[in-house]
Amino acid sequence: MNTAKAQLGKPYVYGAAGPDSFDCSGLTMYAWRAGGVGLPHSAEMQYNAIAHISVSQLQPGDLIFYGTPIHHVGIYVGGGQMIEAPYTGAVVRYASIYRSDMVGAGRP
């Protein structure tokens, strides 16, 4: 969690995985790598690589996935919030997890 929080305000760059810029899966990959867990650099591949949990089971650090096909992932921080690298022109930020295109959640 601390690794993800330390990236707040850094720019979104498609294909980037830190340390100066990130895309969504690059951010989750970078944060979990700091905790000793390897993840692929693709939201869909991350979803397929980890154990799925229900939204009611979310704990800080869990991943939340969006889109069909899956194209976005964020890191749950608690209180219905996540840290995400959202899109070109934006920065790593806090956002609500509640979106109509939520697919599921997982725990690496």
Residues of each region from the PLM?
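Peptidoglycan cell-wall recognition and remodeling modules
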Residues: 1-108
